[in-house]
């Protein structure tokens, strides 16, 4: 039976509550948009498989709660992330200003070399804009990140931003991937990366199993 994917990566969505992280996740994984969502409690995740540079990548995308009371829980998930989206709402100057705090959390809790992309979400709400595109571009430049303005409502730059972060993670792990490619006798092949510790972590949804 052919493998369904070659490698599994964990991506993380972080940012203030209400910036649209869950909407981004649902649009990318299910191509669905709901104008109202109950705030995420702790963490949740969804999966999607895409192909990048001939490699089938299984993406496990974790959606973290932005409320302060959940920070102790959500920070535990930083350490196993290969890629992180830092999300703000273009109609909320406050959420933009808080990106500096989120970057500080990433620097403290995420592994060295984790790949990052800055997202200015809700680009469809132009009439409510409080943060200019140039501000987002400048902040991303300061932190050495790629930048996208997105809209889960209109599907603007959703596939592009998720694909780009996956590409960055693949590039960062190129040596491991190339090494695993040469191990033709290894049944796990590229998927070995997901089982480096051989144990599960407890997600918010107990019916799902995480092997990364």
UniProtKB/Swiss-Prot annotation:
Its BP terms in the Gene Ontology are: exocytosis; neurotransmitter secretion; positive regulation of regulated secretory pathway; protein transport; Rab protein signal transduction; receptor-mediated endocytosis
Q: Where does GTP bind?
A: 17-23, 35, 39-40, 66, 121-122, 124, 151-152
Keywords on record: Cell membrane, GTP-binding, Hydrolase, Lipoprotein, Magnesium, Membrane, Metal-binding, Methylation, Nucleotide-binding, Prenylation, Protein transport, Transport
| Binding annotation for Mg(2+) | 22, 40, 63
**Which residues are recorded as modified (Cysteine methyl ester)?**
212
Instruction: Please give the InterPro entries that the UniProt record associates with this protein.
Output: P-loop_NTPase (IPR027417), Rab15 (IPR041826), Small_GTP-bd (IPR005225), Small_GTPase (IPR001806), Small_GTPase_Rab (IPR050305)
How would you summarize its activity regulation?
Answer: Regulated by guanine nucleotide exchange factors (GEFs) which promote the exchange of bound GDP for free GTP. Regulated by GTPase activating proteins (GAPs) which increase the GTP hydrolysis activity. Inhibited by GDP dissociation inhibitors (GDIs).
Q: Which CDD domains match?
A: Rab15
Task: Give the residues carrying a lipid (S-geranylgeranyl cysteine).
Answer: 210, 212
* Short motif (Switch 1): ranges: 31-45
Q: What is known of its domains?
A: Switch 1, switch 2 and the interswitch regions are characteristic of Rab GTPases and mediate the interactions with Rab downstream effectors. The switch regions undergo conformational changes upon nucleotide binding which drives interaction with specific sets of effector proteins, with most effectors only binding to GTP-bound Rab.
PANTHER family to which the protein is assigned, alphabetical: LD44762P
Q: Which family does it belong to?
A: Belongs to the small GTPase superfamily. Rab family.
Protein's UniProt name: Ras-related protein Rab-15
Q: Which organism is it from?
A: Rattus norvegicus (Rat)
């Amino acid at each position: 039976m052919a493998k369904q994917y070659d490698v599994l990566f964990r991506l993380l969505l972080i940012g203030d509550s209400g910036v649209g992280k869950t909407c981004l996740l649902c649009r990318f994984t299910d191509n669905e948009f709901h104008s109202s969502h109950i705030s995420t409690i702790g963490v949740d995740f969804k999966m999607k498989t895409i192909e990048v540079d001939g490699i089938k990548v299984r993406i496990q995308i974790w959606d973290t709660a932005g409320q302060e009371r959940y920070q102790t829980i959500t920070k535990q998930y930083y350490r196993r992330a290969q890629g992180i989206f830092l999300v703000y709402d273009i109609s909320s100057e406050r959420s933009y200003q808080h990106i500096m705090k989120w970057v500080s959390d990433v620097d403290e809790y995420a592994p060295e070399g984790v790949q990052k992309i800055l997202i200015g979400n809700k680009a469809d709400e132009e009439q409510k804009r409080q943060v200019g595109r140039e501000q987002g571009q400048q902040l991303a430049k300061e932190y050495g990140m790629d930048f996208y303005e997105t809209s889960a409502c209109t599907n603007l730059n959703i596939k592009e931003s998720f694909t780009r972060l996956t590409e960055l993670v693949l590039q960062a792990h190129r040596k491991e991937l190339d090494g695993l490619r040469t191990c033709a006798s290894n049944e796990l092949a590229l998927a070995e990366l997901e089982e480096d510790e051989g144990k599960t972590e407890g997600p918010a949804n107990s019916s799902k199993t995480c092997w990364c």
